[in-house]
Amino acid sequence: MKYTKADTAIIKNATIGNGSTIWHYANLYDCKIGENCTVGSYVEIQNNVEIGDNVTVSSHSFICSLVKIEDDVFVGHGVMTINDLHPPSFRRTGSKRDWGSTCIKKGAVIGSNATIFPVTIGENTKIGAGAVVTTDIPPNCVAVGNPAKIIKNKGKP
């Protein structure tokens, strides 16, 4: 695979597609990154994460285990994903049974500083900056706020 990596990036057991760029101080662990992706500076992507093709994960974002990001998604600066519904469940119990998965569908846009709980964000949906997404958001919608509420439902594209 031919991709570009900054000297300061840490990549351990990650699969990275052709044409992708990994910027300074990014940390990638046991994850899969598609083709023509950009992973910004100071991003952490944990194990069991799958990222499709043509995805941008902007600087200072945290993509935790059990997240799937489909093709053509834009993740803004400082976006945080959460998988532990009752922290610190793993430390407390040694079990990941309280963990949930997140799926961000094709063409979605996640605004800067959004927090994404274990949910599904529909195709072509836009999440506003600073939103806290605690429930599934259907396709072709715009959701903003804390907690995130749908303010526009565009229906089928």
Task: Enumerate the language-model features and the residues they cover.
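Flexible, glycine/small-residue-enriched loop-and-beta-strand segment within the central core
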Residues: 1-7, 12-15, 22-121, 146-147, ...
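Conserved active-site beta-strand element of glycosyltransferases/polysaccharide synthases
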Residues: 143
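C-terminal/domain-terminus segments
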Residues: 122-136, 140
